[in-house]
Every structure is written in C-alpha cells, then in structure tokens.
C-alpha cells in the first residue's frame, strides 16, 4: 500500500498540469475517478477479507473503465473502455463464484481463517480447494491482462498517459498477483494449479 501511495502521489503531481486545460467538469471527473481508484487500490492491498477484496477489485475495474474513456469524443477510446470492462467482468464472475464456493466450504471469507482451516483439516489435494482457487486465478488473468486476455491492455492506452502509467502499468495489473500472494500458502500446496499458473505466466511472458 505504501508503494501504491508513492506512485500515486507522483501521478497526481504530474496530472495537475496534464489536465489543467480541461473544463472544470472534466477536471473534476478525472480527479474523482483517479482518487477513487487510488483509495480502492490501497484498501484492496490492506484487506484481509475476500469479500471486501472483491468489492475494491470491482471499484478498480469501474474506475479503469471511466478513465480509459476520459476522451469520450474519441470513438476508439470508448470502444477500448468497453472491451476492457467486459473482459475484466468475465474474470470477476469467476472470482465471485470462487467466493461462494469458499464461503460454503470454510464458513468465512477471512483470509487468515481460510489459510488456517486449510492446514488444520489437511485437505491440500481436495478438488473443492483447487476449483475455487482456479476460478480466482482466472479472475486474475483478466485483470492482469495475461494470455488469452491480453487484448484489452494495449487498447487501454487510449486513456490519459498518467492513467496508463498508474493503472495499467504499475497498480491494477499487479493487483491480481497480490491477491494470489495473499492466498499463496494454499496455492503452493495445489500442484495442478501451480503448474497451471506457471504455464500461463511463462506463455504470456
């Protein structure tokens, strides 16, 4: 969260001049969604609960949509924002399904409690663990623009340059990696999922 804050302060400082020639309403729109994104990213990184993580995850996608389409008179920018929005929503659906499955299995969405229950019950190879974690990884693939969802990221650069630097290079596209890190103590025990993640990471690279 500290790293997000430092990068965000740099972008905000640069943005002050970058959008200074815009109308007051457009300037307000830009700063509002930029501030909302930064707040959501910080809260996402601090969250120890999958439900709140999902909520902030959704705010990240929403802010990305509006900021990519900031130049809304540009048809290509509008199209790019729509493509990014729906592709990431597809991944969010898998994330939501994973939350339902995890909630039924563990009776909680607190990450520490889930990790503790996982080891106490010695169910590392259980399919009921592998499936929801795979669904979360699919959500990460879309948000992080990994193969086969890389199509939206180059298009997202139609938004303002500071937004491309903050959201689509430094923060949102690594939010999924941070989510996997939070659940890493479980994922590292799921051999099939580890291989799945390694394949997509290597192929995208």
Per-region residue spans from a language model:
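...captures the hydrophobic TM-helix bundle architecture rather than a specific catalytic motif
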Residues: 1-205
């Amino acid at each position: 969260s500290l790293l997000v804050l430092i990068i965000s302060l740099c972008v905000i400082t640069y943005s002050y001049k970058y959008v200074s020639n815009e109308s007051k309403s457009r300037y307000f729109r830009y700063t509002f969604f930029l501030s909302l994104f930064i707040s959501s990213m910080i809260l996402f990184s601090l969250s120890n609960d999958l439900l709140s993580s999902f909520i902030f995850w959704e705010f990240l996608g929403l802010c990305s949509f509006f900021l990519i389409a900031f130049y809304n008179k540009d048809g290509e920018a509008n199209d790019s924002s729509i493509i990014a929005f729906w592709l990431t929503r597809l991944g969010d659906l898998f994330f939501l399904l994973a939350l339902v499955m995890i909630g039924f299995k563990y009776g909680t969405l607190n990450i520490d409690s889930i990790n503790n229950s996982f080891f106490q019950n010695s169910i590392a190879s259980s399919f009921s663990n592998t499936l929801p974690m795979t669904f979360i990884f699919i959500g990460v693939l879309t948000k992080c623009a990994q193969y086969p969802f890389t199509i939206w990221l180059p298009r997202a650069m139609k938004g303002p340059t500071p937004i491309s630097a903050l959201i689509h290079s430094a923060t949102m596209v690594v939010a999924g990696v941070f989510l996997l890190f939070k659940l890493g103590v479980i994922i590292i025990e799921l051999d099939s999922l580890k291989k799945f993640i390694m394949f997509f990471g290597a192929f995208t690279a």
